[in-house]
Amino acid sequence: MKLQNKWFIGAMLGAAVCLVSTSCVDEIKFGNSFLDKAPGGNATIDTVFNSAEYTRQFLNTCYSRQYYGLPYNTDSNGNIPDSSSPYLGKKDALTDCWSLYFSDATVYQQYYLGSLNANYGTRGNIFPYTREMVWEVVRWCWLLMENIDRVPGMDSTEKTQLVAEAKCLIAARYFDMFRHYGGLPLLYASFTGTESGYEIPRATVEETVNYMIKMLDDAINSGGLVWAYADADLASKAGHWTKAGAMALKCKIWQFAASPLFNDVNGYAGGNSEAEQQHLVWYGGYHAELWDNCLKACEAFFKELESQGGYSLNKASEETPEQYRQAYRMGYIRQNSKEVLHSVRTNMSDAFNSSSYMWHSWAVPSLCRTEYPPTQEYVEMFPWADGTPFDWKKTETEGKLDAMFLTGTFKNGEQLLSEIVLTRDPRLYEHCMVNGLPKMLDWSAGTMSGLPYELWVGGYDEGQNAALESGNYATGYKNMKYYLGTEYQRQYTHWVYLRLSDIYLTYAEALLQAKNDHRGAIDQMNIVRARVGLKKDLAECVTDKNLLSDKAALLEELLCERVRELGLEDSRYFDLVRYKRADRFEKRLHGLLAYRLDD
């Protein structure tokens, strides 16, 4: 085996909730033109808010334009966010952990080739300022809040709930944009279309953060949000904002705001640019209280979780690698998972061949437009099954490279391995298709079966992909996350916007940054690791560094743990951005070329 060198240059800087009404009221569809209705269009607004059912449908339209992190639709007419298009590409491919070989995508054309500039058009930026449906959703939510009191046939309890959900939607859409741009114009009402001007100044980072937090605090304290929906209500209510989701989003907002991108002694560009001088892209200095705010938000969330219950990490039914894989997989992929705090849907089930859900259908070998092969750097972040770090050179010296993914035995002249033992962190196999891994993990039982992936040069699956650096296996690996195998066909699809394991790791980061509490941070990380069988204390697994005293080392381990747990969920991209890690964006990356010994 040998490592394959390759260069990627990263630049640092949806989706409908399908709720079916059983009412005899006609469904009204709200397109973007609804925004253009001025006084002459007041009849449209009057029609909508003169019906409780139409008002609910209107809120569902707001939900349908949330951020969906998997490119699934090629609509270029502004009806869905640009980030939902395979022609834009996932931001994960700008990191050190995944690559993209679809040369027509913005990620490839503008970022990999280094041609990005401020004069971009449709899909010309990883998160276009005016083409992500952010401002549409914000205005629609304000319209609902301004008109909710006059809706007949809706009691005050439901009105309070809809307003609270609308405020969560505003906060979430602002956060989606904030992570890319910093300070934003702050809207406090809808426009009628008759105003003399629409010049709204860009707010500071601090003002934008306070705006989002106030929206969430209003929603949380209103009494309109349930903490968690009962199992019987999930079929119709899952995907709606809850109190748990709102409190978790507060943790994430404070985490981003407190990070060095915005909160440091020096601005990213040196501090002398106009945007920095006006505090549009940072706080203007380091403020320790921002990490305190993040810690308080995390403590409040977990205190409420202890009191209310309703959410938990999905646990393995048996202490085996297969069941640890199953526990991790079903924790994020299942719509009714107890660890999903907020999710977004775009359609129902998918058969992998639908033109309405291209995340699957465009990943086929003949297209490879939604395929994101993992890098060798990512694969090596996953430790051995006992939790000790994987080290290529050490493994090679010990002659154990053939066991770096799994071991097994050949019985009675059979050509397939039996008694397979997965030798690495079970999450590796849930993010990466690796050589020798059986192709099926039963949806219900979690048992492995089927032919193994042949990921060597000339192998059945890889063919010449890695040798030519093209196709699904261009790096010697294939993405597993959110794609899985044929067992995922015709299952319900969604994008997890917030999940519990992320908040455990956010809590760990807040403990480290706010209190320098190494032990407390490691304890939170251990909770996440234990779910997949890594039960040995992290500080005992990493023996070449003192994680109980070396803050930089523990922070680096935490960032690695985040991408092991939250791979292909945008986490790595934003983690590198908020810590200003140009070294990882510009790192020379690798794939794996493997050869059969008898070839």
List the model feature ranges, each with a label.
Residues K2-A11:
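Bacterial N-terminal signal peptides that target proteins for export
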Residues G446-T447, Y482-Y483, S501-Y507, D517-D544:
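Active/binding-pocket-proximal capping segment
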Residues N42-D75, S99-Y181, S196-A238, D402, ...:
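Conserved, well-structured interaction surfaces
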Residues V20-S23:
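C-terminal motif of bacterial Sec signal peptides marking the signal peptidase cleavage site
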Residues M177, A257, A514-K515:
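Structural motif corresponding to the intra-repeat A-B loop/turn of tetratricopeptide repeats
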Residues V25-T106, L184, K243-M247, K252-G458, ...:
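An aromatic- and glycine-enriched ligand-binding surface/loop that stacks and positions planar moieties
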